[in-house]
Amino acid sequence: MNRLFVAYKPAGIGSNLFLSRIKREYKTKKAGFSGTLDPFAKGVLIIGMGSYTKLFRFLAKAPKVYRATLWLGAKSDTLDTEMIEEVEILEEFDEADVLKAIKSLEGSLEYEPPIFSAKQINGQRAYDLARAGVEFSLNKINSTIYETKLVSYCHPFVTFEAIVSEGTYIRSLGLIIANRLGVKNGSLSALERLSEGRFKYDNHKPLDIKKSLNMMQNFYHGDSDNLKYGRVLALNDLEIKSDGFYWLDSGSFISIIHVKDAKVNYELGRIEC
């Protein structure tokens, strides 16, 4: 079964366990997802089945839109509600100051990712080391925060939305907001992914893969059997000859090619659609 669609993961379940449920529902063994959501988070998860599991890196998955609720003063190494150690009682802030702290995130942002993350250190996941009590530090990363919005402020909870680049840690954004308000600790009490690029939840409606790819369509004017059997393609037979990734339409299937230095290579061949 080849299928590409957007599912909605509920809070309280890991992405892999949720995928197992999807596999059972659709009676398939081969399926995957793009963009892991933490167990406490909910929201959209792109699901691919069959040969469509190969398409994830070619999908238009950015920017991503999140809605989060920050608990000011809540201390947790996971930066969510999983390991709350203590809660500082704080005086209420002026809403204008809260908005200013949120808007200050916009632009290019350098920050440390959470120690409870999937980042690897010498082949080990950071969250495994953190749970084992190993002390370590992570290199700072850069994210682009395109736009932020204050949704509501009901002290000590701040709900905000953020449009961000791929790989952004929203838990870290929450802590940064707290710090810029002069608060040492802050953890997310809720997190929802509203969309990944153009992908939003629509009751598992199958996606048109030709409209989901993050690249231009090219046109091949040579023998169609070359695409059918995965034979070498000549650059002169392509309508667009400049370097880049392209998809080619063969009616019942597509191929994804990479043009570089006047050579044409297959990235994916014969994906049925």
Curated annotation (Swiss-Prot):
Gene3D superfamilies named among the record's database cross-references: Pseudouridine synthase
Q: Which InterPro entries match?
A: PsdUridine_synth_cat_dom_sf, PsdUridine_synth_N, tRNA_psdUridine_synth_TruB
> Which key words tag this protein in UniProt?
Isomerase, tRNA processing
UniProt key word Isomerase:
yes
User: Which principal EC class is assigned to this enzyme?
Assistant: isomerase
- UniProt KW Cell division keyword: no
Catalysed conversion reaction: uridine(55) in tRNA = pseudouridine(55) in tRNA
Query: What's one GO BP annotation on this UniProt entry?
Result: mRNA pseudouridine synthesis
- Classification via SUPFAM superfamilies: Pseudouridine synthase
Active site residues per record: D38 (nucleophile)
Q: What is its EC number?
A: 5.4.99.25
For molecular function, the Gene Ontology terms on record are: RNA binding; tRNA pseudouridine(55) synthase activity
Family matches, as HAMAP family: TruB_bact (MF_01080)
Give the PANTHER family listed for this entry: PSEUDOURIDYLATE SYNTHASE TRUB1, TRNA-PSEUDOURIDINE SYNTHASE
Tell me, in a sentence or two, what this protein's role is: Responsible for synthesis of pseudouridine from uracil-55 in the psi GC loop of transfer RNAs.
Family statement drawn from the similarity comment of this UniProt entry: Belongs to the pseudouridine synthase TruB family. Type 1 subfamily.
Q: What is this protein called?
A: tRNA pseudouridine synthase B
Species name: Sulfurimonas denitrificans (strain ATCC 33889 / DSM 1251)
Taxonomic lineage: Bacteria, Pseudomonadati, Campylobacterota, Epsilonproteobacteria, Campylobacterales
